[in-house]
Amino acid sequence: MSIMRITVRTFQNEQHAEMFVAISQKIYEDAMKNNFKINFTMIQNPSLKNQVTSIWKYDNEKHIKEVRSYLSKHNSIPNSLSPKEVVFTGDVILDSNS
């Protein structure tokens, strides 16, 4: 059973959100070069461009730990961005892509 984690981040301004998106893109590209398995989608609210939502899908608890460890080692996001975060996590019980 896979696990889904949705994080809604609201930044102080659009520039902080854009910086977060750019850093996330770089982390994703590096993960692909290293053949590290990550599965996420990132969306930006078109009417509130300072709001970014990340949707992560993990295989299991072990995979969550591996991804979080990878991200902590490769994370260069400055603390000054400090968005407000709302997180939703749950087991996937139905997935139309499976």
Where are these regions (language model features)?
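N-terminal acidic leader/helix
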Residues: 6-11, 24-26, 32, 89-91
